[in-house]
Regions:
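Active-site rim/adjacent substrate-binding subdomains
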Residues: 1-165, 170-187
Length: 187
């Protein structure tokens, strides 16, 4: 099993650079395969993360991963709404830790997104202890290459869409704190 990578923190310069595309011929290279494997281990080892972009581990590449825990969070939120139960702070990560699967997005491009934007809370592994509210598109569709170099299209809504947009921002050198309101510090 690969080792977890250190997560770079603001103000590390790689977080403010526009990431470079990965050549199709490099996707199956040992370097990229090892990076993806290490990113999965890194994300799994975080208590609060559901997404991780290559710049967050010091690699200026257009690559991010999202745990399928993001889908579980959407399912739980839908069930909560249907049952009219109020959300509590304990609901943020209410799932037993399990071996999540990961979506891998290489050279992602936004295909379409809803006009409707929704305000929601965000934090970031590269900006620890700071949270804020940010408006994001409610739905988004992204086209990318997977870890085998196969093109795919991924359309998501709600929390998963928010995570995709957050990770896409990382690839553009943007952090959530650049657009968030009501920033608060914890710890």
């Amino acid at each position: 099993m690969p080792n977890a990578l250190p997560i770079v923190k603001e103000p590390h310069p790689v977080l403010r650079k526009k990431a470079r595309d990965i050549a199709a011929s490099d996707i199956k290279s040992k370097k990229i395969k090892d990076l993806i494997a290490a990113m999965k281990v890194t994300l799994k080892g975080t208590p609060d993360g559901v997404g991780l972009a290559a710049p967050q581990v010091g690699e200026n590449l257009r690559l991010f991963i999202i745990s399928d825990e993001a889908e579980e969070i959407d399912r739980a939120e839908t069930a909560r709404r249907k049952s009219n139960v109020e959300r509590s702070s304990d609901d943020i990560k209410p799932y037993a830790v399990r071996d999540w699967s990961y979506y891998v997005f290489i050279n992602p491009q936004v295909v379409t997104g809803s006009q409707k934007k929704v305000d929601g809370p965000e934090g970031c592994l590269s900006v620890p202890g700071i949270f804020g509210s940010i408006k994001r598109r409610e739905k988004i569709t992204v086209q990318a290459l997977d870890e085998h170099g196969k093109k795919f299209t991924c359309g998501k809504s709600r929390f998963f869409a928010r995570v995709m947009q957050h990770e896409l921002d990382h690839l553009e050198g943007t952090l959530f704190i650049d657009h968030a309101t009501h920033l608060t510090k914890t710890g």
